[in-house]
Design a protein with these regions (language model features):
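Ligand-binding beta-strand-loop-alpha-helix segment within the catalytic cores
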Residues: 62-113
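Short, active-site-adjacent cap segments at secondary-structure transitions
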Residues: 13-15, 51-56, 104-105
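Surface-exposed, active-site-proximal loop segments in enzymatic domains
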Residues: 19, 58-65
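N-terminal glycine-/serine-/threonine-rich phosphate-binding loop
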Residues: 1-43
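General structural feature for long, well-ordered alpha-helical segments within catalytic domains
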Residues: 1, 5-6, 26-33, 60, ...
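N-terminal active-site beta-alpha-beta segment that forms phosphate/nucleotide-binding
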Residues: 29, 36-37, 43-44, 48-57, ...
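Short beta-strand segments
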Residues: 6-10, 48-49, 98
Length: 113
């Protein structure tokens, strides 16, 4: 049995049936399942997408520069992570958000070195 897992959630999955914005029911559903696994002793790392809020490549069609569009997509990922972490905490499980781009005090900075 594995003790550590990496879970990838698409941004669209956090947007409910429409796949846009943040759907509280979707966040609650995922959080309950994640909390149940964590309470059973599983260590879970979660990577969220941000496509429910903004997709960098689709920004090109709207006049956004590729690099700026990608940056907005990364911010969307952080927004989703903050939302999901709050719902996980509401289930009584510790949750932290990390970013390789310094954004303190919003989220903790991660640097593998």
């Amino acid at each position: 049995m594995y003790k550590r897992v990496l879970l990838k959630l698409s941004g669209e999955s956090l947007g409910g049936s429409v796949g846009k914005g943040l759907d509280p029911e979707s966040l609650r559903k995922y959080s309950k399942e994640i909390a149940q696994a964590a309470k059973a002793g599983l260590q879970i790392a979660i990577v969220n997408g941000g496509g429910n809020i903004f997709r960098g490549l689709q920004g090109l069609d709207k006049g956004f520069d590729r690099v700026e569009g990608d940056r907005m997509g990364m911010l969307a990922t952080v927004i989703n992570s903050l939302a999901l972490s709050q719902f996980i905490k509401d289930e009584g499980v510790k949750a932290e958000v990390f970013s390789a781009t310094p954004m303190e005090p919003l989220v903790r900075y991660y640097n593998r070195d």
